[in-house]
Amino acid sequence: MPLIGKGNQAVGDLGEQTAADYLVKQGYRILERNFRSRGGEVDIVAKDRQGCIAFVEVKTRRSLAYGLPQLAVTQRKQHQISKGALAWISKNRLHECTARFDVIAVLLQDGSEPTIEHIPNAFDLAY
């Protein structure tokens, strides 16, 4: 898909779809996408083959001019994801579940297949 003229939101949406497709191919089950709560958010909530809930942050870039996508997951962003994850767990009454925080970095460049890097357990719960 040509990226020229696409805004950041469209590129981000394409990156999230690419990440979700990747997870499904790896045997994950997507439980929810774009979960929002007061002060928190999670791009993808998925369950891996072992039953662990993965709260996944997707970072997408069109080039490496501004650095690796995964480096954009700052401490502040980790805090927002953590708040979203806790809200999702509470909403779904899964207080006894095993969970982790993953990052998927997607590099989308015109004329190339997407480059995907999945980083399981990328960070711990951030308060």
UniProtKB/Swiss-Prot annotation:
Family under the similarity heading:
Belongs to the UPF0102 family.
Q: Which organism is it from?
A: Trichlorobacter lovleyi (strain ATCC BAA-1151 / DSM 17278 / SZ)
PANTHER family per the record?
A: UPF0102 PROTEIN YRAN
Q: Which NCBIfam families match?
A: PRK12497.1-3 (NF009150), PRK12497.3-3 (NF009154), YraN family protein (TIGR00252)
What name does this protein carry?
UPF0102 protein Glov_2230
In Gene Ontology terms, what is one molecular function of this protein?
Answer: nucleic acid binding
Record's HAMAP family?
Answer: UPF0102
Tell me which InterPro entries the record gives.
Answer: Restrct_endonuc-II-like, tRNA_endonuc-like_dom_sf, UPF0102_YraN-like
Output the lineage of the source organism.
Answer: Bacteria, Pseudomonadati, Thermodesulfobacteriota, Desulfuromonadia, Geobacterales
Q: From what superkingdom does this record's organism come?
A: Bacteria
Pfam family, any one? UPF0102
